[in-house]
UniProtKB/Swiss-Prot annotation:
Lineage: Bacteria, Pseudomonadati, Pseudomonadota, Gammaproteobacteria, Pseudomonadales
Membrane-topology descriptor: Single-pass membrane protein
PANTHER family the record matches: SEC-INDEPENDENT PROTEIN TRANSLOCASE PROTEIN TATA, CHLOROPLASTIC
InterPro entries cross-referenced by the UniProt entry: TatA/B/E, TatB
Chain positions covered by the region annotation Disordered: 69-139
Sample GO molecular function, one term: protein transmembrane transporter activity
Swiss-Prot/TrEMBL keywords: Cell inner membrane, Cell membrane, Membrane, Protein transport, Translocation, Transmembrane, Transmembrane helix, Transport
Domain of life: Bacteria
Record keyword Transmembrane helix present: yes
Name of the molecule in the record: Sec-independent protein translocase protein TatB
Location (main, coarse): membrane
Family: Belongs to the TatB family.
Compartments (UniProt record): Cell inner membrane
Organism of provenance: Stutzerimonas stutzeri (strain A1501)
Function: Part of the twin-arginine translocation (Tat) system that transports large folded proteins containing a characteristic twin-arginine motif in their signal peptide across membranes. Together with TatC, TatB is part of a receptor directly interacting with Tat signal peptides. TatB may form an oligomeric binding site that transiently accommodates folded Tat precursor proteins before their translocation.
């Protein structure tokens, strides 16, 4: 605490022995020890009361929990990167007017309609039937 070594304590003891004398030195050491003990207890009581009033333990627990949650989030983000835009989930955009046409189609007359060859409609071989559910309807 005060970084006092053995030699310093020995020097203080010798000075106290010379000043107080051999008769009063044991009583002075005992009284000093009692006062130091009382001061330590009162400081620890004051510290505990202040911490209890301001809720330092609760604040420390909350900060600790927040740190743990932040670390957990960081670990999850490092393991699993944020989901990128899934091209299968987004509907395909309709082709632009000039995207599927050849270069010479731009010189055609405006009344001509040209269907793009890139996306021809698929012929349907099945007849269209309304969707039926095999599950019984709920009352």
């Amino acid at each position: 605490m005060f970084d006092i070594g053995f030699t310093e304590l020995l020097l203080v003891g010798l000075v106290a022995l010379m000043v107080l004398g051999p008769e009063r030195l044991p009583g002075a050491v005992r009284t000093t020890g009692l006062w130091v003990g009382r001061l330590k207890r009162s400081f620890s009581n004051i510290k505990a009361e202040v911490e209890r009033e301001i809720g330092a333990d609760e604040i420390r627990r909350q900060l600790h929990n927040e740190r743990i949650l932040d670390l957990e989030r960081e670990m999850k983000q490092s393991i699993m990167p944020p989901p990128a835009s899934n091209p299968a989930a987004t509907p395909p955009s309709p082709p632009s007017e000039g995207a599927g046409q050849p270069a010479n189609a731009a010189s055609s007359s405006p009344g001509d309609t040209v269907t793009p060859a890139a996306n021809p409609p698929a012929p349907s071989t099945e007849t269209a039937q309304p969707l039926r559910s095999d599950r019984p309807s709920e009352p």
